[in-house]
Regions:
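A conserved segment at the C-terminal end of the G1
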Residues: 18-30
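Catalytic donor-sugar/metal-binding loop of nucleotide-sugar-dependent glycosyltransferases
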Residues: 28-32, 166-167
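Catalytic beta-strand/loop signature of glycosyltransferases that borders the donor
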Residues: 33-36, 247-249
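PAPS-dependent sulfotransferases, especially Golgi type II membrane carbohydrate sulfotransferases
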Residues: 1-8, 182-185, 206-210, 215-217, ...
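A polyampholytic, Gly/Pro-enriched intrinsically disordered region
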Residues: 52-62, 188-197, 267-274
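PAPS-dependent sulfotransferase catalytic domain
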Residues: 103-248, 266
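PAPS-dependent sulfation machinery
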Residues: 35-144
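P-loop (Walker A) phosphate-binding loop of NTP-binding proteins
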Residues: 11-12
Length: 303
């Protein structure tokens, strides 16, 4: 069996990663992860932490566990059997890895990781991901795609684990992202906090991607893909993945991703005080520009 190509899509969150996964999985050569966000790779005490050590932003508790790999692995195992296995997502639906593999397959993955991580941690982590993809039914498909939003902020570490991985960075106008996240029960409720939430993630993504080869990264604007440059961006996505166009995928793009679905600039209708959101966004955007981080703002800036 040939080795599947792993694709990791991500972004700030609320930026179109799920939209991308649903489009790609209509192609006969692509299988989407089940669930669309596996979580066990980039979450705290996840596979990256077990195989590479905790990242710079890891919680203190995970740093303490990492002093002993057996303790960190035990926490990984507990979470793989718990919150990553079955959880209620933001839509109130049950999600988790149980949708893609059996408990017996999960335990096989854990046993093999525990056996091999002390010998070659990177190879152990890579093998875990590849075997997970195969267990989820990967057969004739060339690609397996996961769309956990933190993937891009951890792209440098994922690249160390899987050097052949490809990354699709989904971006969206910060004000629409802010409005979207402010309407989530788990999100920041005021514009300043939402602007910080967005800009922090843009900085993390930018820094991580500087450590990844440029030809392994595609940055896609949700607005350009769905609204303003549909044909060009659709073609660019296919070319990046070296995929031939297929009728089912093109039909899905035309019928399920019409331009009116995205409505750039609709943030003004979804917030209580658009002027306050604009001010908070503008201050955050200026900070990003000072750091050399692209904002991917949709449309011309105000005069």
């Amino acid at each position: 069996m040939s080795t599947p190509q792993l694709i990791f899509s991500g972004g700030s969150g609320r930026s179109g990663t799920t939209v991308l996964a649903k489009l790609l999985r209509t192609h006969p050569q692509v299988r989407a992860s089940r669930p669309l966000e596996i979580r066990c790779l980039t979450d705290s005490a996840g596979l990256l932490d077990v195989c590479l050590g905790p990242g710079a932003d890891a919680p203190l508790g995970v740093r303490a566990l990492a002093r002993s790999r057996p303790l960190l692995f035990a926490e990984f195992r507990r979470r793989l059997r718990g919150r990553w296995w079955e959880r209620t997502n933001r839509l109130g639906k049950v999600s988790g890895l149980h949708r893609g593999i059996t408990p017996e397959q999960r335990e096989t993955l854990l046993r093999e990781l525990q056996r091999s991580v002390g010998q070659d941690a990177r190879e152990a982590g890579r093998s875990f991901l590849l075997e997970l993809a195969r267990m989820q039914g990967l057969d004739a498909e060339r690609y397996w795609v996961d769309t956990s939003p933190p993937n891009i902020a951890h792209a440098d570490r994922i690249h160390r684990l899987v050097p052949q991985a490809l990354f699709v960075h989904m971006v969206r106008d910060g004000r629409d992202t802010m409005a979207s996240v402010m309407n989530e029960s788990w999100g920041p409720s005021d514009p300043e906090a939402a602007a910080t939430w967005w800009s922090d993630r843009m900085v993390a993504a930018h820094r991580a991607l500087t450590e990844v080869p440029a030809d392994a990264v595609l940055t896609l604007s949700l607005e350009s893909l769905v609204v303003t440059e549909r044909a060009e961006e659709y073609r660019r996505l296919l070319e990046f993945l070296d995929l031939p166009d297929r009728p089912r995928m093109r039909r899905y793009f035309a019928e399920q991703m019409p331009a009116e679905r995205v409505r750039p600039g609709s943030w003004r209708e979804r917030v209580a005080d658009p002027d306050q959101v604009e001010r908070a966004y503008r201050a955050a955007a200026q900070r990003l520009e000072a750091l050399g981080v692209p904002t991917h703002e949709f449309g011309p800036p105000p005069p």
